[in-house]
Amino acid sequence: MIANRKICVLGLGSMGMGVALSLLERQFEVIGFDINDNAMKNLESAGGVAKSSIRAAVEGCSAVIVLVVNDKQVEEVLFGKDGAVEGLSSGAVVVQSSTVPAAYAKTCGERLLKQGFE
């Protein structure tokens, strides 16, 4: 069993909300962030916790799942000012599930590994 069942979902559109709801059904604590206020309200209505910033959303989470639109958004969410890498603990698992070019996915993974993430 996973000791820390706190998982962050960044991007609460159709895919992200589906993932968040599935995690909630399996008794995970789900923290989320999205630029759309309605998506945040929907997460809270389902039993999740919405945070006002990416950094606040990832703090204390054992994993973060990124489900945004493209590589530009992934870059901002992970590596931008107050992005996920600034708030995640070393060793946290990062699952990048956005549609991005293969070269970007490889580079992104390498950067995350160098910073101590799985």
Describe each region flagged by the PLM.
Residues 1-66, 92:
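NAD(P)+-binding Rossmann beta1-loop-alpha1 motif at the extreme N-terminus of oxidoreductases
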